[in-house]
């Protein structure tokens, strides 16, 4: 999605159209993690006329970078839409999502560790909606004691998240959504562009 945003932003810049960038200012501080999203985010913010940030920290990131566009803190529209789902529960489920390209070369190691956990804690249902990328799919045979699902619509994924006791993920969005529903999220990445979740104890 950041690639699509960057492509549209660059086209608008070339056509001298105004650019309004939603979810601006997320930063990990490492161009390789997440890759290529971190680079796209920095480049879009540089050419945007208006940057809409979700938090004070993300706004401060843009101030530190001395971007030329205006900066407005507007909150997170994704989380606004989660209110309609109601209150979460806490069942013996653990939701897993792993897909990031910087994780592809050790995806088999991640899956082996998940399989070990599923064997060690059989009273939990480990659930993974597996990503369609071939670099992920080729390792699905490792997951013999894990409930492997085909990719889910967002609303169905959120329903499982709301019932889960724990989330294990390399997703940026699930860090936000898990924190919103007061779930603990184990982040399978070297860094995160959402440090607010660390300060609240969810990540």
Question: Each predicted region: which residue ranges?
Answer:
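Nucleotide-activated sugar donor-binding and catalytic core shared by glycosyltransferases
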Residues: 1-128, 133-203
């Amino acid at each position: 999605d950041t690639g699509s945003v960057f492509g549209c932003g660059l086209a608008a810049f070339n056509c001298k159209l105004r650019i309004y960038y939603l979810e601006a200012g997320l930063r990990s501080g490492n161009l390789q993690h997440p890759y290529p999203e971190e680079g796209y985010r920095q480049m879009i913010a540089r050419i945007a006329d208006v940057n809409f940030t979700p938090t004070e920290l993300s706004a401060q990131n843009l101030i530190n970078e001395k971007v030329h566009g205006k900066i407005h803190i507007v909150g997170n529209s994704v989380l606004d839409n989660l209110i309609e789902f109601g209150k979460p529960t806490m069942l013996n489920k653990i939701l897993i999502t792993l897909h990031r390209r910087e994780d592809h070369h050790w995806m088999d190691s991640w899956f082996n560790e998940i399989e070990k956990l599923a064997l060690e804690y059989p009273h939990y249902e480990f659930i993974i909606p597996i990503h369609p990328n071939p670099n992920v799919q080729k390792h699905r045979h490792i997951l013999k004691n894990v409930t492997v699902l085909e990719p889910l619509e967002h609303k169905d994924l959120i329903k499982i998240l709301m019932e889960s006791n724990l989330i294990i993920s390399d997703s940026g969005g699930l860090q936000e959504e898990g924190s919103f529903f007061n779930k603990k999220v184990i982040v399978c990445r070297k860094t995160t562009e959402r440090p607010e979740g660390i300060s609240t104890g969810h990540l």
